[in-house]
């Protein structure tokens, strides 16, 4: 593994660690949350320490360097060019899902989720006065989950304003195909619905190909808010940074109005360092180890 030691056992107790200390008996190995026990890449730790040594932790802005790092990463990872002005920011993907719903919808509007799904999808809708449309994915005898578009068509009405999509899907493990995504966005276009896409696990696919929603076609690009974060990729969920890619100017301005008051002193640094210097930790180390 070279300089990255994924066999090191690290005791996280005594650090207010949710995974190990939040109502977890000492004789239980916790596997309930997507939070790995690998040490952060040394490049990230060194850069964070350098910033910590500066005595002022004030407000920060999302710099050109940060945006350039994201644009570069998306280009290298998915071979797709985005524009830096399409980017929006948040403290994490879950807050970003809420921000998207607040910017797109009003209380009483209906939102599609495809279940079983990551539990914050439920709370982000219900706790903000929106209504869930529960589309239960079909599951065949081999445990393969899929969208039933005929049934989905019958579930919605003109009060439905958004579809929340998790791709790769948590927890069923599906990576939706290009054909499925094209059908989903055609469905959204027919009903004038925006797709809010959580693609946070897309860097951790072991086999096959992840197709970002924004790469399908121009029509899909104008109907999606795509959320991503390096927190799962680099195992740094405690650092508050996520980004959205929003090509549609109207949707982006609405999102920015909700996001305008959110700042964190280390978000720009942590993402910039992860993408520029820590890529080997993920590409050559973590994923191969897993």
Language model segments and positions:
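N-terminal small-domain helix-loop-helix segment of the aminotransferase-like
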Residues: 2-92, 99
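PLP-dependent aminotransferase class I/II
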Residues: 62, 223-290
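Short acidic capping loops at alpha-helix termini that bridge into adjacent secondary structure
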Residues: 81-87, 107-110, 159, 221-224
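Conserved PLP-anchoring active-site segment centered on the Schiff-base-forming lysine
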Residues: 103-125
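A short helix-loop-beta submotif of the ANL/AMP-binding
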Residues: 127-133
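Helix C-cap/helix->beta junction micro-motif
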Residues: 128, 190-191, 220
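Active-site phosphate-binding strand-loop segment of PLP-dependent enzymes
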Residues: 138-208
């Amino acid at each position: 593994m070279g300089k990255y030691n994924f066999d090191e056992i690290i005791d996280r107790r005594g650090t207010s660690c949710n995974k190990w200390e939040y109502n977890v008996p000492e004789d239980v190995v916790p596997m309930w949350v997507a939070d790995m026990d690998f040490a952060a890449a040394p490049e990230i730790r060194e850069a964070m320490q350098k910033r910590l040594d500066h005595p002022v932790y004030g407000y920060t802005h999302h710099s050109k360097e940060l945006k350039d790092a994201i644009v570069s990463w998306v280009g290298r990872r998915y071979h797709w060019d985005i524009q830096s002005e399409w980017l929006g920011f948040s403290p994490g993907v879950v807050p970003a899902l809420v921000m998207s719903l607040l910017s797109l919808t009003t209380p009483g509007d209906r939102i599609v989720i495809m279940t079983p799904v990551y539990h914050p999808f439920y709370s982000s809708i219900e706790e903000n006065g929106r209504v869930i449309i529960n589309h239960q994915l079909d599951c065949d005898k081999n445990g393969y989950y899929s969208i039933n578009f005929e049934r989905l068509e019958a579930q919605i009405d003109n009060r439905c304003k958004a579809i929340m999509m998790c791709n790769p899907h948590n927890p069923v493990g599906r990576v939706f195909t290009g054909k499925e995504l094209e059908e989903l966005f055609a469905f959204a276009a027919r009903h004038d619905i925006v797709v809010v896409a959580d693609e946070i696990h897309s860097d951790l696919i072991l086999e096959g190909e992840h197709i970002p929603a924004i790469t399908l076609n121009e029509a899909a690009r104008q109907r999606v808010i795509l959320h991503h974060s390096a927190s799962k990729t680099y195992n740094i969920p405690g650092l508050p940074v996520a980004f959205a890619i929003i090509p549609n100017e109207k949707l982006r301005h609405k999102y920015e109005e909700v996001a305008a008051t959110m700042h964190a002193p280390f978000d720009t640094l942590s993402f910039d360092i992860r993408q520029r210097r820590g890529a080997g930790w993920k590409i050559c180390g973590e994923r191969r180890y897993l």
